[in-house]
From Swiss-Prot:
The active site is at 96 (nucleophile), 192 (cysteine persulfide intermediate). GO terms for biological process: tRNA wobble position uridine thiolation. Belongs to the MnmA/TRMU family. The record marks 121, 334 as: Interaction with tRNA. It is found in: Cytoplasm. The keyword Ribonucleoprotein does not apply. InterPro entries: MnmA-like, MnmA-like_C, MnmA-like_central, MnmA-like_central_sf, Rossmann-like_a/b/a_fold. One of its GO terms (molecular function) is tRNA-uridine 2-sulfurtransferase activity. ATP binds at residues 8-15, 34, 120. This is tRNA-specific 2-thiouridylase MnmA. GO terms for cellular component: cytoplasm. Catalyzes the 2-thiolation of uridine at the wobble position (U34) of tRNA, leading to the formation of s(2)U34. It catalyses: S-sulfanyl-L-cysteinyl-[protein] + uridine(34) in tRNA + AH2 + ATP = 2-thiouridine(34) in tRNA + L-cysteinyl-[protein] + A + AMP + diphosphate + H(+).
Length: 357
């Protein structure tokens, strides 16, 4: 019997090529377009979608839509706002992957009677010793494994990544061969629900009275000396230099955001370096838990370079991470993700940063 795969269809070139590759390999493909910015549907259900992915008759397949706007608002937008109001720097894409995309795809597969799901992410999986391992995509410029650390064994067990061993240039080439309508579509780097990628303006409009509540707090130096007033701690980011409105004999950078005292801390560039941080919400992909310290390679942002670190478990899904060499401008709210060679071991959200002195 032909195996059925539900493919997440975003409208971009990657998901379209992933679907076409699976069709070429003999799978029965059904597309699922998850709607996240529509009018919320109180009882989400599958509906036929008019999306046509390819102009080539051999690569046309049914596409369904699933309105998860209410869930997206609850799980992603509220998280995004809450993290900024807590003085953190959120990463909504990885939360969306876990709480929206995989949730929706697995539900779609259940409703459509499909055995597997697939996405256009540049990542790979393999089964070993009865468990699924997650690996980097082979194209180092497009590897998206950093954004997938929250996935569970249940998520990965039914997932395939058709683009995991391909370079972006090859995907574009295949898109033209398959007659994909989005073959020349440019990639978007913006957060989908933040117009013009201006998160400050978004927060001002989304959170009534925010500007009045947070404006006028102190900007202080490393000794606690007041240097000036800020326009609201949520509107600053760790490592920021421009836009502080300060005059100083040396460049000053934002080193910490203190929500409790409505304070923005600053220091010189070296004060942004740290070797120690704490993560929470730890997800250890291949093992059920982390029981003892392990050595790994870690990164603290998408384009960061992985460097050696020691991961020591703490209670309640937390861990202390000690890097062998300093990381720069570590921001609470971002994710630390851990690797062994090409394998993604797991990750967690950065909850505290211990500055080196």
């Amino acid at each position: 019997m032909t195996e059925t795969v539900v493919v997440g269809i975003s409208g971009g070139v990657d998901s379209a090529v992933a679907a076409c590759l699976l069709m070429k390999q003999g799978y029965r493909v059904l597309g699922l377009n998850i709607r996240i910015l529509d009018t919320p549907d109180e009882h989400p259900s599958l509906a036929p979608s008019p999306l046509l992915i390819s102009d080539h008759a051999d690569y046309q397949f049914p596409v369904f839509s699933l309105n998860l706007s209410a869930r997206f608002s609850q799980e992603v937008i509220r998280y995004f706002q809450a993290d900024y109001l807590a003085g953190k720097t959120p990463n909504p894409c990885m939360v969306c992957n876990k709480k929206i995309k995989w949730h929706g795809l697995l539900e779609g597969a259940r409703l459509l009677g499909a055995e597997r799901i697939a996405t256009g992410h540049y990542a790979r999986t393999a089964s070993l010793d009865g468990r699924v391992r997650l690996y980097k995509g082979l194209d180092p410029q497009k590897d998206q494994s950093y954004f997938l650390w929250m996935l569970s064994q249940n998520d990965l067990n039914k997932t395939c990544f058709p683009l995991g061993e391909l370079a972006k240039e090859k995907v574009r080439e295949l898109a033209r061969t398959f007659g994909v309508r989005a073959a020349e579509k440019k990639e978007s780097q913006e957060i989908c629900f933040v117009p013009h990628d201006d998160y400050c303006r978004y927060l001002e409009l989304a959170v009534p009275g925010l500007k009045e509540k947070v404006a006028g707090g102190d900007i202080v130096d490393e000794n606690g000396k007041v240097l000036g007033k800020h326009r609201g701690y949520p509107f600053y980011t760790i490592g920021q230099r421009r836009g502080l409105g300060l005059s100083s004999t040396e460049p000053l950078y934002v080193t910490a955001l203190d929500q409790e005292n409505n304070c923005v801390h600053t220091g010189n560039k070296s004060s942004l370096d740290t070797r120690s941080l704490t993560v929470s919400g730890l997800n250890w992909i291949n093992n059920k838990s982390l029981d003892e310290p392990v050595e790994a390679f870690g990164k603290i942002r998408y384009r960061d370079r992985e460097t050696p670190c020691t991961i020591a478990p703490l209670p309640d899904g937390q861990a202390t991470i000690t890097f062998h060499t300093a990381k720069h401008a570590v921001a609470p709210g971002q994710a630390a993700v851990f690797y062994h060679d090409e394998e993604v071991l797991g990750g967690g959200f950065i909850s505290a940063v211990n500055r080196d002195r």
